[in-house]
UniProtKB/Swiss-Prot annotation:
The keyword Ligase applies. This is Formate--tetrahydrofolate ligase. Its EC number is 6.3.4.3. InterPro entries: Formate_THF_ligase (IPR000559), Formate_THF_ligase_CS (IPR020628), P-loop_NTPase (IPR027417). It comes from Lactococcus lactis subsp. lactis (strain IL1403) (Streptococcus lactis). NCBIfam families: PRK13505.1 (NF010030). ATP binds at T65, P66, A67, G68, E69, G70, K71, S72. GO terms for molecular function: ATP binding; formate-tetrahydrofolate ligase activity. Pathway: One-carbon metabolism; tetrahydrofolate interconversion. Keywords: ATP-binding, Ligase, Nucleotide-binding, One-carbon metabolism.
């Protein structure tokens, strides 16, 4: 079979104006970024404000292997399957971060015959949104350091600055740096550090904002540091939220592209799900809901991370809950949860599938606990055997949950027709949605509920630093915000090697970070890194460009 990039380059890509026409947008309604990409201006969205919203399908997954389980692939393939059935459908995805693309993933725009196009552009610089976020974030750092240099009128304590610089790369050498060296003319020396751009609160703000005015209001609330008298210092105190919003003006507009089969796709925003909230922008999802009858969207990593945050954070801003949830499962991941070594995952082992099923079962029950209908999509790999597939189907159906074998990687939309057919019936059902926690509950109670009811843990411990931060959050009146858990994606716990469905474990909250602009509190569990490093053999070693500009090696 051809590689992803070979399939993408051979695809018959349509002018983006043709794709826009499918969803009722004229040439004047879009801003072209070349022939195959466009942005949708916010004023165009206002035209559809009174239009009824379509059905919303959330695609999530079990706890993944390092290679991922194909959520984006299934999301794209499912949308194409609905389109083949004559449905008015759109897909809404996150934009890939360049760091993981160059590092381990080698591309994140779907796979096989279920991809979004133009694949190379989407995986690289796309329409420049992430670069705009990088610039906005680092402009804040520049204004902050300038305030220190110019007499420190805000009385900022340089030892208590929590705002970091960012770059959209995996670069471990930048995790801890010192700035302001070289004498009085070069600023105030202090410790600093870099995060990867998609971890920036600016990314979360962009993804949760609903208008330019909302964007400015959220930016003004971002907490940058503490003063010497331990009061929060915000971007609003610096007085540059208007300038930062100006830098993000175009990045706020959703990006329109297409799938291999010509289904309209909105790709906008890309926060990580193990650190941030892991969902594409509210504006893109709202736009898709107004312009189509069915919207397929995904949330990063497993249902314990992106799935939980989609339901407890994003839906509160979106004003709509999913009408159904698809949980993507792979036999290789289930065998990993069943105790097999990574080298053994391509070999048949039905017993390991049965043992690892505990992971999928917990994710199913978690999503059902929100009152949502659930279907399992088995994302087929070439190494899967009939016996393993049969065992997984039997186990899933024994729970009373529908299941579908999807072959969208190899067959595109055709390989998702069964999933689309089963979902069509489910979308007619009424869900009885309820949130995991009430926003008025204490922050500690919200964290307890996520850990005990979603993860299966027994106790939450807090570091001395986290206890102090909890008191500060209460004193500042931030207690009624949702919690955004930051932990490993590989396990329900905060320990990446504790696989399947562990119970009775304890987790430790080491830090609580106020993301007031985004509108949530981040609870850092375990050893989550906000700036990834590159592997020994990064995916970029296989990437190249020919003399005539043709790219290779983006998986």
């Amino acid at each position: 079979m051809k590689t992803d990039i070979e399939i993408a380059q051979a695809a018959d890509i349509q002018p983006i104006t043709k794709i826009a026409e499918k969803i009722g947008l004229s040439f004047d309604d879009i801003e072209l970024y070349g022939k195959y990409k466009a942005k949708i201006p916010l004023e165009v969205l206002d035209k559809f404000d009174q239009q009824s919203e379509g059905k919303l399908v959330l695609v999530t997954s079990i706890n993944p292997t390092p290679a991922g389980e194909g959520k984006s692939t299934v999301t794209v393939g499912l949308a194409d399957a609905f389109a083949r059935q004559g449905k008015n459908v759109m897909v809404a995805l996150r934009e890939p971060s360049l760091g993981p693309v160059m590092g381990i993933k080698g591309g994140a725009a779907g796979g096989g015959f279920a991809q979004v196009l133009p694949m190379e552009d989407i995986n690289l610089h796309f329409t420049g949104d992430i670069h705009a976020i990088t610039t906005a974030n680092n402009a804040i750092s520049a204004f902050l350091d300038n305030s220190l240099h110019q007499g420190n009128p805000l009385n900022i304590d340089p030892r208590r600055i929590i705002w970091k610089r960012v770059v959209d790369l995996n670069d471990r050498a930048l995790r801890h740096v010192t700035v302001g060296l070289g004498g009085p003319l070069n600023g105030v020396p202090r410790e600093d550090g870099f995060d990867i751009t998609v971890v920036s609160e600016i990314m979360a703000v962009l993804c949760l904002a609903t208008s330019i005015s909302d964007l400015k209001e959220r930016l003004g609330k971002i907490v940058l540091a503490q003063s010497y008298d331990r009061k929060p210092v915000t971007l609003g105190d610096l007085g540059v939220q208007g300038a930062i919003a100006m830098l993000l003006k175009d990045a706020l507009k959703p990006n329109l592209v297409q799938t291999i089969e010509g289904t309209p796709a909105l790709i906008h925003g890309g926060p990580f799900a193990n650190i941030a909230h892991g969902c594409n922008s509210v504006l893109a999802t709202k736009t898709a809901l107004k312009l189509s009858d069915i919207v397929i969207t995904e949330a990063g990593f497993g249902a314990d991370l992106g799935g939980e945050k989609f339901l407890d954070i994003k839906t509160r801003q979106l004003g709509k809950q999913p009408d159904a949830v698809v949980i993507v499962a792979t036999l290789r991941a289930l065998k990993m949860h069943g105790g097999l070594d990574k080298k053994e995952l391509t070999k048949e082992n039905v017993e390991a599938v049965k043992k690892g099923f505990a992971n999928l079962e917990r994710h199913i029950k978690n999503m059902q606990s929100y009152g949502l209908p659930v279907i399992v999509a088995i994302n087929e790999f070439a190494s899967d055997t009939k016996s393993e597939i049969s065992a997984l189907k039997d186990l899933t159906e024994a729970l009373g949950v529908p299941v579908s074998l999807t072959q969208v990687f190899a067959k595109g939309g055709e390989g998702g027709l069964d999933l689309a057919e089963k979902l069509s019936g489910m979308l007619q059902e009424k869900s009885d949605f309820s949130y995991l926690y009430d926003l008025k509950e204490p922050l500690s109670a919200k964290i307890d509920k996520v850990v005990t009811e979603i993860y299966g843990g027994s106790k939450v411990n807090y570091s001395p630093k986290a206890k102090r931060q909890m008191r500060e959050i209460e004193e500042n009146g931030w207690n009624d915000l949702p919690v955004c858990m930051a932990k490993t994606q590989y396990s329900f716990s905060d320990q990446p090697n504790l696989l399947a469905a562990p119970e009775g474990f304890e987790v430790t909250v080491r830090e609580l970070l106020p993301k007031i602009g985004a509108g949530f509190i981040v609870a850092l569990l375990g050893d989550v890194m906000t700036m990834p490093g590159l592997p020994k053999n990064p995916a970029s070693l296989k990437m190249d460009v020919t003399d005539d500009g043709k790219i290779s090696g983006l998986f």
